[in-house]
């Protein structure tokens, strides 16, 4: 099956991932980067795994509502994982944000498979995750896409995903801290041009934003490299999603601003 065959142009609202409803609680504190204490509705306090190593600028609100996934396993120390946080949105109302950085690659893959990006990427035959590339093949690209025979552009597509949760007003920003890894990814994306296509996908894990820009305030060098990459031909596709207790749905592409 070709990914994205015969999908309608407007797919806004299409659920891409559906799961058992998450458990709601109140965030007490986040500490040691990977841990968060959350009080559940019955008053029980649980420690959840926080799969987000960054500062979580603008989305860390002790006393605010959060959603956790319960998945006990002998392989894992903690049975709970922090998935979503409720934050003040751009229009003054509350907005749910996806904070689990392990999710965006799955989400973008699901969007491609559903045909959400067919207009931008063309028809795709295969999607391979975590393929070695770059200098001395020491990096791994998030997704390597192969076009179908009918795709007018026959080049491979190197696609890098960035979980984006920070915003100012209605503009989503990445990064929210200095990221040498992110800088390196931009350089390596430029390196696959022009023989292959290079695509940067900011995964906008909140639905109150209408544009994306590099977070120059947090990492000026990233901003410089972002604009350099854009000028060199790296395609920027900010994908927006709505996060709910039992599903995540496609909200369409957002515009790109070279600067906020």
Q: Where do the PLM segments sit?
A:
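Short aromatic-glycine-enriched beta-strand elements
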Residues: 32-37
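Short alpha-helix capping/helix-loop boundary micro-motifs
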Residues: 46-56
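Short nucleic-acid-contacting surface segments enriched for D/E, G, S/T with interspersed K/R
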Residues: 54-67
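Flexible glycine-rich surface loops and low-complexity tracts that mediate binding to linear polymers
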Residues: 64-74, 240-241
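Short, Lys/Arg- and Gly-enriched loop/turn segments at beta-strand edges
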Residues: 73-84
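Active-site metal-binding core of divalent-cation-utilizing nuclease and nuclease-like domains
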Residues: 95-102, 109, 113, 118-165, ...
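Nucleic-acid nuclease catalytic cores
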Residues: 168-183, 187-218, 240-242
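Domain-level recognition of nuclease-like catalytic cores that cleave nucleotide substrates
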Residues: 205-260
């Amino acid at each position: 099956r070709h990914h994205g065959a015969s999908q309608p142009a407007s797919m806004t609202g299409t659920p891409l991932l559906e799961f058992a409803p998450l458990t709601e609680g109140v965030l007490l504190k986040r500490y040691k980067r990977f841990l968060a204490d959350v009080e559940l509705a019955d008053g029980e306090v649980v420690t959840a795994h926080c799969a987000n190593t960054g500062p979580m600028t603008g989305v860390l609100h002790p006393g605010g509502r959060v959603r956790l996934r319960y998945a006990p396993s002998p392989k894992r120390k903690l049975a709970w994982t922090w998935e979503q946080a409720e934050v003040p949105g751009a229009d003054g109302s509350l907005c749910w944000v996806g904070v689990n950085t392990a999710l965006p690659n799955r989400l973008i893959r699901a969007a491609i498979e559903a045909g959400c990006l067919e207009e931008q990427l063309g028809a795709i035959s295969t999607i391979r995750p975590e393929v070695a590339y770059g200098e001395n093949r020491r990096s791994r690209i998030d997704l390597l896409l192969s076009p179908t025979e009918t795709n007018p552009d026959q080049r491979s597509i190197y696609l890098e995903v960035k979980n984006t949760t920070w915003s100012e007003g209605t503009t989503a920003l990445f990064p929210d801290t200095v990221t040498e890894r992110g800088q390196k990814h931009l350089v390596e994306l430029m390196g696959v041009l022009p023989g292959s296509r290079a695509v940067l996908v900011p995964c906008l894990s909140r639905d109150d934003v209408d544009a994306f820009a590099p977070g120059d305030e947090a990492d000026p060098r990233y901003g410089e490299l972002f604009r350099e990459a854009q000028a060199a031909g790296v395609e920027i596709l900010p994908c927006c999603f709505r996060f709910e207790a039992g599903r995540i749905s496609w909200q369409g592409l957002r515009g790109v601003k070279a600067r906020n």
